């Protein structure tokens, strides 16, 4: 949680996941990424969305006749996912503790998941165990920070984060036999609407 203050000066918390999810709502992320995934995976089938967050991409990719399940450890994101029309079956756990049966889903999706960069080989093995057919990872390919979601508006010397493109980190962490069969790139624009800039900056 990020500390902030309400109009009366009382300290309150800003949920960074909710902040990021709201920015994805107003960005063209899904409009640009979902068609690219569909071209590579024309039949999604039963979908497992790992680290689903706000569920925007999974919701766009899910097929009406297929099952959609979401592994999501964040309570606030699970509330958000539950409010969707046709919400996914929720698994309240992290990826390494999730009790999802093996080979239960046709497609396993992991979009902007830290595990793809932190533990790519172990995470890929887990994803492969869950799928009957396809694993799809969406990782950042831009040179920029990956921590605070508005840090990209700041110079490097202000935010101090590593700006190595996520795809470089992922590929560096995978063994030769684990390299992806197909890689595609999408250009999209991160658009966050901030009702109170002073509140966010405090």
Model-derived features: positions:
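A short SAM/SAH-binding and catalytic strip from SAM-dependent methyltransferases
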Residues: 107-119
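A short acidic, Gly/Pro-enriched loop at the edge of an enzyme's catalytic core
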Residues: 100-107
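A short glycine-rich, Lys/Arg-flanked "PGG" loop and its adjoining helix->strand segment in the class I
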Residues: 121-136
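Class I SAM-dependent methyltransferase SAM/SAH-binding core
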Residues: 54-97
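Conserved class I S-adenosyl-L-methionine
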Residues: 1-42, 44-53, 136-162
């Amino acid at each position: 949680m990020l500390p902030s203050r309400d109009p009366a000066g009382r300290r309150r918390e800003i949920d960074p996941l909710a902040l990021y999810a709201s920015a994805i709502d107003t960005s063209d992320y899904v409009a640009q990424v979902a068609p690219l995934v569909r071209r590579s995976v024309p039949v999604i089938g039963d979908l497992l969305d790992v680290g689903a967050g706000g569920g925007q991409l999974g919701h766009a990719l899910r097929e009406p006749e297929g099952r959609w399940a979401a592994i999501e450890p964040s309570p606030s994101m699970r509330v958000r996912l539950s409010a969707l029309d046709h919400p996914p079956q929720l698994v309240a756990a992290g990826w390494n503790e999730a009790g999802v049966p093996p080979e239960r889903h046709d497609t396993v999706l992991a979009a902007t998941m830290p595990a793809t960069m932190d533990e790519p080989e172990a995470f890929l093995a887990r994803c492969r165990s869950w799928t009957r057919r396809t694993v799809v990872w969406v990782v950042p390919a831009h040179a920029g920070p990956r921590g605070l979601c508005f840090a990209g508006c700041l110079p490097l010397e202000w935010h101090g984060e590593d700006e190595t493109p996520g795809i470089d980190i992922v590929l560096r962490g995978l063994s030769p036999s684990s390299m992806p069969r197909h890689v595609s790139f999408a250009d999209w624009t991160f658009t966050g609407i901030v009702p109170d800039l002073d509140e966010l900056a405090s």
